[in-house]
Every structure is written in C-alpha cells, then in structure tokens.
Amino acid sequence: MSIVTKSIVNADAEARYLSPGELDRIKSFVLSGQRRLRIAQILTDNRERIVKQGGQQLFQKRPDVVSPGGNAYGEEMTATCLRDLDYYLRLVTYGIVAGDVTPIEEIGLVGVKEMYNSLGTPISGVAEGVKCMKSVACSLLAGEDSAEAGFYFDYTLGAMQ
C-alpha cells in the first residue's frame, strides 16, 4: 500500500484529517516521483542488457544450472530461465514506480517458492539470478538511485528465501 493510500486509510479509520507529518511524507513521496520514474525508465531501457548479463553471471557462478540435467540446460530452458529473470526485473520496476512493494508482492511473489518447488527448480538458482541482475542494474545507476533500485531487488530476494 502506497504512503498516500496508507495515510488516507489511517486518517479515515480515526475520522480525522491528515496530520502535518502525514502531509509532509506525502509531499516527499510526490516530489520523489520524477526520480522513481527516471530509475524505472533506465532499467526498462536496459532490460535486455540487465537480463542477458545477469543470466551470464548466473551461469558462470552456477554452471550446474546450464549443465546436462540442470534446469536451464539447452536453448529452450535457458530462454525460459532468462524469461523468468525478465519477469522479476519487471516486478522491480513496478515497485520502484509505485514507491512501494505491494505490486511486487501482489503480482508476482505469492507462492513463488511453492511454484518453483513444484517445477523441480531450485529457488536458490532463481534468487542467484536476481542477485546477478541487481548487480548489473545497480551498476547503471548512481548513489541514491542505485540504493532505491537495490531495495526492491532485495525485497524480491527476501521473498525467495
């Protein structure tokens, strides 16, 4: 739930107007909107690079994934793995734009561990791929922008633990 929605819900539950502190937090959130949109745009514009390089890093760190018997062995399965990484990058951009983890949670993380377990895919490999993408993505950003994006990658990784 965004800070705007959360503040309104809390104030309404208490039948009161928004407090000066709540209004200041909302103002700060609104003012940071341009920065969040810029970060999401950079990640979106570089999505192919982030996914490709993140995948390459994953396959170097975890050669078992692309070896015979591995979950990303063969051209088709490698493409499926990269498709999944792209999906998690997209979720991260949703969180950045919203300034909140709710879209990540509600759209893509509910049941993620169970899904991969049912497919026989080790969640640790998926998480490692997301970590690798975080490294690539954050290298494209500086300072606060990198920290902002990193937060949403870390949230996604936390749900995979």
Swiss-Prot record:
Highest rank taxon of the organism: Eukaryota
Keyword Chloroplast: yes
Membrane topology note: Peripheral membrane protein
GO CC annotation terms, alphabetical: chloroplast thylakoid membrane; phycobilisome
GO biological process: photosynthesis
Subcellular location: Plastid, Chloroplast thylakoid membrane
Protein modification: Contains one covalently linked phycocyanobilin chromophore.
Binding residue positions for (2R,3E)-phycocyanobilin: 81, 83-84
InterPro entries tied to this protein: Globin-like_sf (IPR009050), Phycobilisome_asu/bsu (IPR012128), Phycobilisome_asu/bsu_sf (IPR038719)
Keywords: Antenna complex, Bile pigment, Chloroplast, Chromophore, Electron transport, Membrane, Methylation, Photosynthesis, Phycobilisome, Plastid, Thylakoid, Transport
Modified residues (N4-methylasparagine): 71
Chief place of localization: plastid
Quaternary context: Heterododecamer of 6 alpha and 6 beta chains. The basic functional unit of phycobiliproteins is a ring-shaped hexamer formed from two back-to-back trimers contacting via the alpha chain subunits. The trimers are composed of alpha/beta subunit heterodimers arranged around a three-fold axis of symmetry. The phycoerythrins also contain a gamma subunit which is located in the center of the hexamer.
PANTHER family in the cross-refs: ALLOPHYCOCYANIN ALPHA CHAIN, PHYCOBILISOME 32.1 KDA LINKER POLYPEPTIDE, PHYCOCYANIN-ASSOCIATED, ROD 2-RELATED
Protein name as annotated: Allophycocyanin alpha chain
Protein source organism: Pyropia yezoensis
Gene name of the record: apcA
